[in-house]
Amino acid sequence: MFKTKKGNLKSLDYKKQDYVIKLSNTDSNNLESVLDSKIGLNNQTRQNNISKFGSNQIVVKKFLIFKKILETLIEPFNLLLLFIGILELIIYFLFQRNWITLISAFIIFFMIFLASIVDFIQEYKAYKFNLKLTKIIENDVFIFNDQIKDFNNLNYQNIKNNLIKEKQSNLTIGDVVYLSKGDIIPSDCRIIWSEDLYLDESTLTGESKAIKKQTTNNKTNFLELENILFKETLIVSGNCLAVVININKDNYSNSLLDLIDDEIITDYEKGINKVTKILIYLISILVFIITFISLLKTGISNWTSSLVFGLSIAVSLTPEALPAIISSNLKLASKRLSKNKVVIKKLSVLQNIGSVNILATDKTGTLTLDTTNIETYLDINNQKNKLLKQYFFYNAYFQNNLFDTIDKAIIDQFKTNISDIKLIDHLSFDHNFRISSVLINFNNSNLLITKGSLEEILEITSFINVNNQVINLCDNYKNMIIDQVNSYAKKGYKVLVLSYKNSDVIDNKNLIYLGMVVFSDQIRENVKQVIDTFKAYDIDIKVLSGDNLYTCKNVCDQVGINSNTSLIGKQINNLTKEELIKISQSVNIFYKLSPLDKAKIIDSLKSNNVVGFLGDGVNDAVALKKADVGISVNNASSLAKQSADVILLEKDLNALEHAFIIGRKTFSNAIKYIKITVASNFGILLTLLLATILFKFEVMSPIQLLIQNLIFDFANLIFVFDNVDESSIKKPQKWNIKSIIPFAIFNGLTQVIISFTNFMILYFGFNIKGLDTYSIELFQTCYFIECILTHIMIILVLRTDKLSFFKSIASKQMLISMLFFSVVCFMIVFISSSFNSLGFKMMIGNFNNINLSWWFLILLGLEILAWIISEIIKKIYLNIFKNWI
């Protein structure tokens, strides 16, 4: 989680260090006096402590206003504009006192301000919005809802009935929290009871080695204190009870926030950066050529005018609004998703969501409901055995697992008296070994009870209880057990079996088989329709499960997932990386998987695919991190939530369906803006290059180029509100930088053709040849208007691969905005022409005995022609490249 700028956290001056060390070295019975609080709080004392100490409010990295402003100002495009603006000021003050040059410089600075302020506002809004989302998805923690009075007899069984769930932010000094494997420490704590406790403290120390923790301390180094749990570290095994000793900003990890550099550049952001560099290089080279040609034609004595003209072209072609538009696009999508109960932890992951073409998911709780029901329990004779029921209950009851739905179902439905039972030891369920054991004192003898999946239990079982007689487990009985279990598994039931023996230790060998319990999962409502929708959007579903093949196949058949191909977890290690990549593409069911198996499968699926993985358990954390889009749910383990990119507030595939669609729409609008902007700018740049060669005058003045760019900037902001064709989101889209150049070359030709058609009409039809100032200004005004309207027409045509206006229409917001900016274009010309400023002249009256008003009718024809040419080029481009946006 933490990537520091300085690197060495141990040197940090932490104001509460001595206090924490003192608590570490204080005996548990004396903690109350040091903490100035009861150890363990009920509702009343908790409220009193919150009033006294405060609560563990979420602390996030500060939004540093001046730093963010500086970051927006030094965006590459803004730096380019800043350089040009300063250069124009130098020209004005030292070489050419032309007020147009001064105004031009101020317009450039205004453009920088505009782009920066929009980007800054979007960043700030995103920050505030993320604060709200952070509170929504904060972790719950189990707390002991009473005072701890006897520190010598603490254990899970004594306290579990008093555990309640509480939001992490509601913790206060003195709260006692129960933590187990996969939990992320919610606040700095002092351990008061532990069992085989190991932590991963790499978030603080950078060392991934598991660190043993216990109730006593023998270390002096602050970060090595053996009974202190630091916020944001992770429990990798065991469990504990710990008292909260720091909250809010006093937590050690929160004091590090200013040292943290948590910015990870995604492929999407790398792509944007690459496009930015390409555009800057392209603009710089071509502007240099245009300036050089202009200089050759006007002479060295007029170098300042040529330079200002070249600089103005550079400004007009610089898409300085790109960061703001991308940011707005992502933020709008994030808001839409939050309304659909989907929380995006990092905005840039939206691009990956739109590109997902494989969704890997667990079966339990996703395709089926989280609740589990017991259908029956049977011994080898297909009889409901009372002893079997009791032993299953003992095994489940004495497990230190608050989240296991299997154990919960057993405890709820197999209630048995445990007053004479004493727990000696236990072995929690492990996804690699797939068994759980308890060692209890029962009827004055020690009894080992182990439950698990069929294959794993049979490997450690040598005997069988038949009619209360223990005999050898021969092949005949073994086959009977397998047939009995499979008869239920084939019907879609989950089956666990149980073996036992008298033992003083947990050694799990030579056990006695007793029987099985059968569980049923209910298919989620409407899940089949959602799966069908995923298929329609070209998303392949892969089931990654720890269950057996029969159970997985039954569920998949019910929800419409192809179950013809499957792969068992133990085969994965026998395959080479290349073999696994090849096989995983065609397999839909992966069963009996360990956490490492899941991660390997996700890794193999990522070859030529964008993979989403939906998981909620501790065992899913590695796979969630491996996936291109890790998806978890709000009630998942804290480790799963931390590892995920996307959090579903409800475990509902419908919400995920909305996420994929909105992700694709967001991606489509972003790429649409980039491609259309590059195409239009390329067309304008090529037009100006050719015009500089062919004409003796500038076809558009520097100030007009800047005004045009301002209009383009405002117009482009509307892209985020555009509709997206259903056909363009039917298939996952990938970020392909290489496609931008051919798209720009082909579709930029429309701008060139229309502009030069306009030039020829003005030059030969209206006899406007730039022989005097008035003639030049008429020519420039006509090009200014035509260029803006053609740009708007190109936007409306290129936004879709369909026949624009007939088979695909832009959103109302976009159409109204484009109409508005068209009107603004004419208003600027009319107003400035009336005041004889900015070099605009209205096409009214006569010029060389020709009625200039006819040009407006020609302009209409030019825009219709622009639409026709754009559609023809679109058709040609699609035939060649087969893909549009």
PLM region descriptions:
Residues 290, 324, 402, 559, ...:
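Membrane-embedded transport module
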Residues 40-71, 135-143, 147-159, 209-212, ...:
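Non-transmembrane, extramembrane segments of multi-pass ion/lipid transporters
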Residues 228-234, 352-513, 519, 532, ...:
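Cytosolic catalytic regions of ATP/NTP-dependent phosphoryl-transfer enzymes
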Residues 82-107, 281-318, 331-341, 684-703, ...:
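Helix-interface capping motifs at the ends of transmembrane segments in multi-pass membrane proteins
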Residues 1-172, 177-178, 183-185, 190-198, ...:
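Non-lumenal N-terminal regulatory segments of integral membrane proteins
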Residues 104-140, 145, 264-358, 517, ...:
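Hydrophobic alpha-helical transmembrane segments
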